[in-house]
């Protein structure tokens, strides 16, 4: 299809270990909106141990900045492709994972729990880090099996022989999102009625809608040139369906003590004791 421009949002662990504060989330939300206004597909690359959990970040409304970025990336009317290239933990990765298509490199890890919380699970349930990772399910293969990601890329950062796999995914991933939106519009003409209602509200907004738009922190389209087409509406709707599919729900009964899944019984303490005893006996 020839050369195309895309917007890239990436986390870099060599700078501040990839930890984002409120200022990073706010800037990213602005960039995402800017890309969408220019009709540029958005690529997000996740590699972070999590959002900044310290007092200064929370004092600057860290939680709100994360929520705003999630809302902005869910609201854009262009294809969004998310790829986990390394670590993807907690609020640092969740916003960038709000994409039409979510992929993971074969050595990538992803979880909504912060690393410190995982460490608490290790101590609480007497688990080794390997056992904790197994029960929680953070590897790319476990994530795919659980339905939390859409695919695995056969590439590891630093490899040169498989770099074409990564480059191919960038192209085919965006093309598949666009193909899916085109097929959805063709098979569901009712979306045209929905789009027509959107146009009507844009041309003749109600006073209450105008008041809501005036107080919104999301970037709203004000000029006809920037206004999304029907495929932009399809991207948003299909993204919502994809995100809804990844979210798992449970009842209080299933979550409580009567749950069918037993609490894992770790053997970390026993294993450490055996190793220390073996070392002591060999020293004797």
Describe the role of every protein-language-model region.
Residues 1-15, 25-53:
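A structural preference for short, pocket-lining loop segments at secondary-structure junctions
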Residues 18, 50, 88-92, 232, ...:
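Glycine-centered flexibility motif
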């Amino acid at each position: 299809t020839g050369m195309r421009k895309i917007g890239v949002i990436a986390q870099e662990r060599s700078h501040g270990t990839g930890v984002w504060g409120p200022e990073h989330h706010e800037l990213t939300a602005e960039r995402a909106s800017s890309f969408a206004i220019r009709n540029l597909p958005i690529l997000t690359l996740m590699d972070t141990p999590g959002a900044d959990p310290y007092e200064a970040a929370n004092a600057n409304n860290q939680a709100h900045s994360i929520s705003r970025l999630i809302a902005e990336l869910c609201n854009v009317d262009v294809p969004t492709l998310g790829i986990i290239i390394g670590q993807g933990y907690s609020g640092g990765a969740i916003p960038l994972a709000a994409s039409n298509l979510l992929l993971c490199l074969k050595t990538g890890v992803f979880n909504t729990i912060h690393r410190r919380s995982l460490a608490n699970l290790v101590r609480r349930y007497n688990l080794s880090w390997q056992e904790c990772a197994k029960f929680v399910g953070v590897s790319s293969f476990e994530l795919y099996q659980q339905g939390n990601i859409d695919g695995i890329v056969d590439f590891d950062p630093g490899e040169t022989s498989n770099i074409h796999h990564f480059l191919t995914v960038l192209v085919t991933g965006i093309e598949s999102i666009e193909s899916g939106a085109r097929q959805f519009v063709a098979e569901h003409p009712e979306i045209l009625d929905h789009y027509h209602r959107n146009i009507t509200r844009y041309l003749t907004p109600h006073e209450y809608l105008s008041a809501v738009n005036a107080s919104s922190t999301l970037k709203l389209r004000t000029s006809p040139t920037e206004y999304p087409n029907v495929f932009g509406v399809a991207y948003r709707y299909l993204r919502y369906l994809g995100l809804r599919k990844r979210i798992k729900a449970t009842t209080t009964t299933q979550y409580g003590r009567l749950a069918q899944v037993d609490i894992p019984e770790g053997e970390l303490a026993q294993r450490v004791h055996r190793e220390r005893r073996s070392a002591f006996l060999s020293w004797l």
